[in-house]
Amino acid sequence: MNKIDELTPKKVVEKLDNYIIGQKEAKKQVAIALRNRIRRLSLSEDVRKDVIPKNILMIGSTGVGKTEIARRLAEVANAPFVKVEATRFTEVGYVGKNVESMVRELVDSSVNMVKKEMMEEVKDKAQRLVEERIVEVLVPSKKRAKAQPSFMDVMQLFNQNAEYSQNKDYDENEDENIRRRREELLEKLRNGELEDVEIEVEVEEQSSPMFAGLGPELEDMGIQFGEMFQNLMPKKKKRRRMKISEARKVLEPIESEKLIDQDKLIQEGVSRAENSGIIFIDEIDKITSKGVSSGPDVSREGVQRDLLPIVEGTTVMTKYGSISTDYILFIAAGAFSEAKPSDLIPELQGRFPIRAELSDLTKEDFIRILTQPKNAILKQYQYLLQTDGVKIEFTEDGVERMADIAFELNEKVENIGARRLYTVVEKVLEEVSFEAPASGEWELKIDSNYVDLRLGKVYGDEDLREYIL
């Protein structure tokens, strides 16, 4: 059983619990959807082709965890993931990006993911090649100019046999000296003794996109053609002077890429995008037509109709070849505060059979969000300030007070969910963050009194809190 087979729905939910508080139903549904994809891969070919993923529609107000659930799911499954906003697309024929661009982005993400894995596999070999290349720069071999023989050279051929053995001995001695010198420097290089030595290396010059500034759709096409032309043209190279420590970072990706099988990379990247890819479509409620059939709503419905074949399953042309969207998992999300899921066109509703409703966060949820997740908000600030020698301790009543203020602000001003916590915590720690670098090492206890001291004036003034918190 390999690593992906071990991802049972329960284990997926457990992993999601490390990052996301609450929303048990939504976690359960995405975990089942992921497991069904794993089950599908175990089926025979004739059955597998008929089993398509059941797409998910998440319904919940902003800041309750919709995006985070989808993003962490892709992370757990090590699957290619791309997030797009439905509002950025326009109907075919209008100025703007068309819906096929999301599939191209997914394939790019997938290929880059596979490339990163392959580069990690050849990392040791690439590092050795980089060291050899650096040593060759430090101790270059003798360059022998090969000019056309002159008349005098031809006349001297009679004496060449007599001189050949002497020249050969000289060349061999010189090559031996170069080899010995390189071995000495290689040992020093591996011991880190030469990191600050400056050398001159030859690197490929980065060229600007050929079709930039043409508008979203034409630019998308232009990038495909631009990369194709750049691959046909010889690469421009330039010489740069840098320290060996920097040269390692510049040369390692170049050497790693030479060791990678590009055909295998593209094949695996495309396959992973088609069979494991996840596309998260946010703000899908913003393209509902609400029963109106004129004005800007015509374009909104047009976007829905353009989305339909992508979600149903079609073939999209990309720079890596044709990509089938039949088995890509689509997760759509929206607050649906001013519209209902039933306002989507019926055909699109039918393509998102699983509905996951996310509940609004409570004060207790806020307390848990501040403290419980892996690298929770308060832990992040503690780590950041610790780098400047400041040790922060949050008391229980201090955490409760921040959660209480964030919850009340969501109730009275605008409900932005857990994002409100960042605003509150940032304001509480504003003075500390400003003073920390110049104050040396010190400790600070943040309790409810300190929170009120930092937020009292802003929180008490209705006009100020609307603009600042």
UniProtKB/Swiss-Prot annotation:
GO molecular-function terms, A-Z: ATP binding; ATP hydrolysis activity; peptidase activity; proteasome-activating activity
Annotated ATP binding sites: 21, 63-68, 282, 347, 419
UniProt subcellular location: Cytoplasm
Record key words, sorted: ATP-binding, Chaperone, Cytoplasm, Nucleotide-binding, Stress response
InterPro entries: AAA+_ATPase, ATP-dep_Clp_protease_ClpX, ATPase_AAA_core, Clp_ATPase_C, HslU, P-loop_NTPase
Protein's GO biological process: protein unfolding; proteolysis involved in protein catabolic process
A Pfam match: AAA
Any one annotated GO CC term: HslUV protease complex
Tagged with keyword Chaperone: yes
Function, in words: ATPase subunit of a proteasome-like degradation complex; this subunit has chaperone activity. The binding of ATP and its subsequent hydrolysis by HslU are essential for unfolding of protein substrates subsequently hydrolyzed by HslV. HslU recognizes the N-terminal part of its protein substrates and unfolds these before they are guided to HslV for hydrolysis.
Family the entry assigns: Belongs to the ClpX chaperone family. HslU subfamily.
Assembly with partners or alone: A double ring-shaped homohexamer of HslV is capped on each side by a ring-shaped HslU homohexamer. The assembly of the HslU/HslV complex is dependent on binding of ATP.
HAMAP family linked to this entry: HslU
Annotated protein name in UniProt: ATP-dependent protease ATPase subunit HslU
Gene that produces this protein: hslU
